[in-house]
Amino acid sequence: YIEFPDGLHLFFYDTTMNVKSELTANYGISWENKKLMEVKDDVVITNHDKNEVLNTEHVVWDQAKKKIYSDVFVKRTTPDGVIYGEGFDADESLNSWKLRKPRGEFLFEEEEN
């Protein structure tokens, strides 16, 4: 395994090598043989395309399944407001997120009849 006791800053790129998202944490560990990375302690994930930021204390990146997830409290800040949850699931590219047990303020547009 490779340990990052002083933290890490990862960049995720699209096919044209533009930075789509970033992940920072104060600690990380990567198990190359398991294709698994765990980061914790002030984890911040930024999705530049959607102008969203997710804050939490623990994230697992399962490279074999191409999934990123957490089982602890998360705060997701979007242009429309702040939503809280008890964990999240996302695809590896961080384009699709699903908060577990979400709560907060939600904006809905009413349909006209």
Regions found by a protein language model. Give the residues of each.
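Mature-chain termini and adjacent capping regions
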Residues: Y1-N113
